[in-house]
Amino acid sequence: TETEFITEVVNQVNALCESGRIAAITAGLDTGNQEGCIDNVTLLVKVGSGQDDKSGPYYPHKADGAGQWELFGKKVAAYNVIPSTRLWIEENGMAYDWGYTTISHELLHSLGAPDLYRTTGDLGEPVGIWDHMAAVSAPANYPLVYTRKDLGWIPEADTPVVTQSGDYTLVP
């Protein structure tokens, strides 16, 4: 199960730290509002073809640790699982580096961004290719103002709202 997998990884990392084989990370782990928790841990997992579907624990996703595990003396608040099969993709004989885009998509979930694609029913594309949370693509798209505002990166006052029909000029 996923819980057993995460427990095993955390136990092995802690054992390596205790034995001195790797150094514990002691700074910069609690930069959010989790008070004493590691805000996010990203696990890159080597898996074979077919082991990365949604029926198992190794598909790309964000999950809450809820303080269930302790790493470097701090509880884990959230974690991302990224299977090795999603780091590169081959299409039409070309290999594309998707690692950074998959990792950043899942990290944005840890920061609070929702998916902006449909998973059930009408599979339309609510925001198309225009937001990183709408699709994992190479190159990665930048989050829309909606997502950045939702994450608190843009103050509410800096986001104008159009309330009337008309012609508007967008200034880059």
State the predicted function of each range.
Residues 20-39:
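Acidic, glycine-anchored loop motifs typical of Ca2+
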Residues 2, 36, 96-97:
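Aromatic-acidic/polar surface patches that form glycan- and anion
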Residues 1-26:
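N-terminal catalytic cores of secreted or lumenal carbohydrate-active enzymes
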Residues 40, 46-172:
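Extracellular hydrolytic enzyme modules, especially secreted metalloproteases
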